[in-house]
């Protein structure tokens, strides 16, 4: 069976009450973990389960473009 490698983005958000939420925009999946390592491991597992569910041949990655914006905030 042919294998391919894909790259996905992990956006980590530190939660006020503790732990981390992590989002993968290419696959549109969220998960969480107690620390960064745990959150990333959970994302890897969730991504692999998602790919198995849809089937590698049917996998469609959303195109993600990142741009940083600077905003002026008046206090």
Show which residues each predicted segment covers.
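Short amphipathic alpha-helical segments
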Residues: 21, 37-40
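A short, exposed loop/beta-hairpin motif centered on an aromatic-Gly-Thr core
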Residues: 27-37
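Short aromatic-glycine-(Arg/Gly/Cys) micro-motifs in beta-strand/loop hairpins
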Residues: 12-24
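Short, charged, surface-exposed hinge/linker loops at domain edges
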Residues: 1-9, 13, 41-75
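Structural detector for hydrophobic anchor residues on beta-strands
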Residues: 8, 20, 29-31
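Flexible, active-site-adjacent loop/turn segments at secondary-structure boundaries
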Residues: 25-28, 57-59
């Amino acid at each position: 069976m042919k294998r391919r490698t894909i790259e996905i983005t992990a956006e980590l958000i530190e939660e006020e009450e503790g732990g981390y939420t992590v989002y993968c925009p290419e696959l549109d999946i969220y998960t969480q973990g107690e620390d960064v390592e745990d959150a990333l491991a959970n994302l890897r597992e969730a991504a692999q389960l998602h790919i198995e569910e849809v089937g590698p041949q049917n996998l469609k990655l959303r195109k993600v473009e990142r741009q940083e914006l600077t905003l002026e905030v008046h206090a």
